[in-house]
Amino acid sequence: MVIDSLSGFELAVAPTFREDFRESLFRMVAALAELGVTVLMTSELEDRYTDLRFSPYGSAFLTDAIIVQRYIEVESRLERVMAVVKVRDSAHSKEIRQYEITDTGIAIGERMLRFEGLLGGRPVHTAQAPGQRP
């Protein structure tokens, strides 16, 4: 089941009782998981860059996996990057990678080797890629 996005779902489920939404979402996801249903949820966040919250609802504890996608500026161009933040019970890649949406699907690109601070909103261009000699 796909919930795209949590903010629209919140308006439908708890239009007058927003404080009940988190509990309602928890109960629904737990019931669906018991039935063997996979739930994919998207959440659009304001880019504050100062905090790396992954949901305005405090619902990250419900998830088995979190993938963050973000636009960044690189050399006066907007680029898309993604990173796997969480995969429950799994050793996953912690790399930040560029990606493109093409006519044939999503193309995962290169690691962002020469930059730091990408997800925090203050990217810094480093002189060389990690592990390289000057």
Where do the model's predicted regions map?
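P-loop NTPase motor core
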Residues: 1-66, 74-76
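Conserved P-loop NTPase
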Residues: 65, 69-134
